[in-house]
């Protein structure tokens, strides 16, 4: 018998932790005969020597055979006994709201990640991977067949623990219950010292888990994993992590490991898996789900019998101490292919001020700015003295503060249908280099931000919703068509800080999308007419008891389109109320198209309309704004995969 322990460790100075911890993942490989001893290797080596001396470790070619189906009821009585023993040890140190079914899947999914060509489809934040101290330990065990070894890698198992919590095959109730943030917080504070190692080894040697180290392949792998998880959580202090580890990270990248590829969202502090019934994710708490009560666990030696399926605990809620930033939330849905998420930096912000005139201007210095549409530019609207605005011109490369209120949607439509990066609609605002702010007398920073995102993460649409019919006009629309459906639209209404007690905001969204996604549609004829609509809006001021009448002349764009075929439609109307809470309110809707084009779109047109109405109410006045968008593309031949460009105007 030969033993080789190689310990390699280093720390990145920029991301130095106050303590070093070690995580383990075991793999059988070939290795020469050598012997190097360290504190960590000594304990692992002694453990391996004892197991090998007792002829408890054997190598087989198919270690995954017994765990290809996640069903603990198919296990033997001994396996089931060890499972409950492990779970009791797990919960005795760090109680988490984790059901038996979820815990079973976590353990059994560990084995599936070494299958060839497997791909991680994780929705868990993996950004700490880039900041970890790396440690690799190698233990060589000789057998009659060949020299085999076990590799323990801190990097590998840290990734493994995150990846197994959100596997593609996990049941939705399990995915919704997994305590992502709690587990991530624990992993930052693992104190694997010599004393804790000795305690863990002692508890493990006295546990019923050791009796499962038999010659059966399934039990070998089951208990290797059991020991790893037991060692991990037995030495965890259960102290929440500090969010500073997330702040100085690079942009989203693809991470390739021995378990496959995944997207690492470094900017996502509160990455959350959306519920199957709601896309509104404003609460940091773990959703509650009713799970059937499992069978009673058997009585095991040196363990406590569990009487309930779940153990309730208050989740750790990360806090952000910046003055102008609320929690960043990104709704991420697993996809069939890895892709980065794009965040624009040219979204204007809103503020409210006193005593001036609202005016929207175009940045004429932008050489890429499209020509001005007639009768729609340089519109100035007079409003009462209690409001004013300021337009600030910024450089194209300057990051506007409103980008911290980004809500991104990536969502599968049905089954295995996902949006493709080729299927994109790009909407560029005419004031993409300008910022219009509105603040009230009590604040110096914007208090409201309205942003609409359309289609995939590579596609976005920003509405600068203002009071008194101040509309953000999109001058140029680029339509790209493919054989896949668009996915999602999200409206985010986010306060920068708590609104005054006398201020409430109500936003109503109505979406109607029309399309001709079939090559059978031979033509589309569109007639556009303009009319002038006179409206009168009233608003009270601080200085007057009576209402001040304000005459408005609003151009209306009427579009009448006739097609040869039937146009599928999807409509959605929703309201959201924003009061004194500082949390964002999110509306999400999908099903923009009802069918999938089977071939390139030929002689067809894509058109869609939507409007957003926002009403801001204070104790003494109410201001409303309605944003209407109408886009009509001309008749086009064979637009796939080419690009068509149309003009659009909001009124």
Curated annotation (Swiss-Prot):
Keyword check for Membrane: yes
GO cellular component terms, A-Z: host cell plasma membrane; membrane; virion component
Chain spans, region Disordered: 275-303
A Pfam family: Herpes_U47
Bias kind Low complexity: ranges: 275-292
Family (UniProt): Belongs to the herpesviridae U47 family.
Protein name, UniProt field: 120 kDa Glycoprotein O
Organism: Human herpesvirus 6A (strain GS) (HHV-6 variant A)
């Amino acid at each position: 018998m030969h033993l080789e322990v190689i310990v390699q460790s280093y720390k990145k100075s920029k991301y130095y932790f106050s303590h070093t911890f070690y995580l383990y993942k075991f793999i059988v490989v070939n290795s020469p005969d050598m012997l190097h001893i360290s504190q960590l290797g000594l304990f692992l080596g002694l453990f391996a020597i004892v197991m090998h001396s007792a002829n408890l470790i054997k190598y087989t070619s198919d270690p995954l055979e017994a765990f290809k189906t996640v069903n603990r009821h198919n296990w033997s009585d001994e396996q089931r006994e060890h499972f409950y023993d492990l779970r009791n040890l797990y919960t005795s140190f760090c109680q988490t709201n984790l059901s038996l079914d979820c815990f079973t899947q976590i353990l059994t999914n560990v084995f599936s990640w070494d299958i060839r060509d497997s791909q991680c489809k994780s929705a868990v934040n993996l950004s700490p991977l880039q900041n970890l101290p790396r440690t690799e330990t190698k233990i060589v065990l000789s057998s009659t067949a060949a020299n085999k070894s076990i590799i323990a890698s801190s990097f590998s198992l840290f990734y493994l623990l995150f990846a197994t919590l959100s596997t593609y095959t996990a049941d939705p109730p399990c995915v919704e219950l997994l305590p992502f943030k709690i587990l991530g917080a624990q992993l930052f504070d693992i104190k694997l010292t010599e004393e804790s190692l000795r305690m863990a080894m002692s508890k493990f040697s006295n546990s019923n888990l050791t009796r499962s180290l038999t010659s059966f392949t399934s039990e070998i792998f089951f208990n290797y994993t059991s020991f790893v998880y037991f060692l991990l959580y037995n030495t965890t202090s259960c102290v929440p992590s500090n969010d500073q580890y997330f702040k100085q990270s690079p942009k989203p990248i693809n991470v390739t490991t021995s378990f496959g590829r995944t997207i690492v969202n470094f900017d996502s502090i509160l990455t959350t898996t959306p519920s199957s019934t709601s896309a509104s994710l404003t609460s940091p708490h773990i959703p509650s789900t009713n799970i059937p009560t499992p069978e009673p666990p058997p009585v095991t030696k040196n363990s406590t019998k569990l009487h309930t399926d779940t153990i309730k605990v208050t989740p750790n809620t990360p806090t952000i101490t910046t003055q102008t930033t609320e929690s960043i939330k990104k709704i991420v849905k697993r996809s069939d292919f890895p892709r980065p998420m794009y965040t624009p930096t040219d979204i204007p912000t809103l503020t409210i001020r006193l005593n001036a005139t609202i005016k929207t201007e175009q940045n004429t210095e932008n050489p890429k700015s499209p020509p001005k549409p007639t009768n729609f530019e340089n519109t100035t609207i007079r409003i009462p003295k209690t409001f004013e605005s300021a337009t600030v011109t910024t450089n194209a490369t300057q990051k506007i503060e409103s980008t911290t209120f980004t809500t991104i949607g990536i969502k599968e439509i049905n089954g295995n249908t996902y949006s493709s990066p080729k299927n994109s609609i790009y909407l560029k605002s005419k004031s993409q280099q300008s910022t219009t702010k509105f603040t009230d007398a009590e604040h110096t920073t914007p208090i409201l931000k309205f942003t609409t995102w359309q289609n995939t993460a590579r596609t976005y649409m920003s509405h600068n919703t203002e009071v008194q019919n101040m509309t953000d006009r999109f001058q140029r629309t680029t339509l790209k068509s493919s054989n896949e459906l668009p996915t999602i639209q999200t409206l985010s209404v986010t306060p920068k800080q708590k609104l005054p007690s006398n201020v409430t905001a109500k936003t109503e969204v109505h979406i109607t999308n029309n399309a001709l996604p079939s090559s059978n549609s031979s033509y589309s004829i569109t007639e556009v007419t303009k009319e002038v609509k006179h409206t009168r809006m009233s608003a009270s001021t601080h200085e007057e008891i009576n209402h001040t009448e304000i005459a408005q002349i609003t151009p209306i764009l009427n579009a009448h389109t006739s097609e040869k075929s039937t146009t599928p439609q999807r409509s959605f109307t929703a309201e959201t109320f924003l009061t004194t809470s500082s949390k964002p309110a999110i509306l999400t809707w999908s099903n923009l198209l009802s069918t999938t084009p089977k071939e390139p779109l030929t002689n067809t047109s894509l058109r869609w309309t939507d409007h957003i109405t926002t009403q801001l109410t204070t104790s003494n006045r109410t201001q409303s704004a309605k944003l209407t968008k109408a886009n009509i593309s001309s008749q086009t031949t064979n637009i796939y995969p080419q690009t068509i460009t149309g003009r659009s105007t909001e009124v």
